[in-house]
Amino acid sequence: NATMIVALGNHDSAPSDVAAPSNLPDGLADQLSWDWDNVAALVKSEGWGDNVTSEKIRTHYGGYSISPRQGLRVISLNTDMWYRKNPFSYLNIDNPDPSHMLRWLTDELQAAEDNNERAWIVGHVLPGWDGGDSIDNPTNLLYHIVSRFSHTIAHSFFGHKHEDMFHVWYESQSGNSSSVSRETQNARAMAFIGPSITPLSNVNPSLRVYHVDPETYEVMDYSQYYTQLYDFEKLNKTGPVWELLY
């Protein structure tokens, strides 16, 4: 049986793009707790996780960790916490982790290291300094975390861009973009950035099947599929036909 892993995107809240850290005063932190409650209830009702998983989702902004196979820990993050369109990202901006989500990620990676597990990090908005998606301070801290646990992290997986991309994590010396040496010998990990099912941004819907080593949990290859939007009108009774792209 396949295990469903849920990772919240920036359109999975109402209003969109918003996630509030739990340390806001005057009850402001609770204004989106209904979202985490709904996700927790969905995961439990669909059998994608147990009571422990459901409680993690409630207390980590929709994020959680799960071990679908022996030796593998999957850590799902709510990446709206570093998304540039989230207005709450700019409160206490000098603090790279006001939500303590990255502290929790570090704890999960430490537990994986202690248990000789490999880890997958799953999220929506990818980190980076291009100014397009994520703010700098959380990105700086996340690079430090990945550098520290690069031997434990098998891979990370993101989306959001609606395009077929990849991201290389490099050794971070002092936690800012200018200190990162983008030389081959300083590469520490990589992230797969999958294209989207939605045709938004004028793309054909796509899906990806990863081929994974069952011992190391490294991705050895993947198959990229797509379906032609032009064919949808004549497929209204059968659904899309997926074709192998490469």
Region annotations inferred by a language model:
Residues 2-3, 151, 186-189:
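A short helix->loop->beta-strand "cap" motif at the edges of active sites that frequently abuts
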Residues 27-111, 115, 163-246:
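Metal-dependent phosphoesterase/phosphodiesterase active-site architecture
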Residues 84-103, 110-158, 168:
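Active-site-proximal segments of metal-dependent phosphoesterases and phosphodiesterases across multiple
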Residues 16-19, 130-135, 165-170, 203-205:
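A short acidic (Asp/Glu
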Residues 18-35, 132-146, 174-178, 192:
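Short, electropositive alpha-helical surface patch
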Residues 10-13, 126-127, 157-164, 195-198:
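Catalytic metal-binding/acid-base residues of hydrolase active sites
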Residues 9, 77, 105, 121, ...:
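Divalent metal-coordination and catalytic microenvironments
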Residues 1-21:
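Core catalytic region of metal-dependent phosphoesterases/phosphodiesterases
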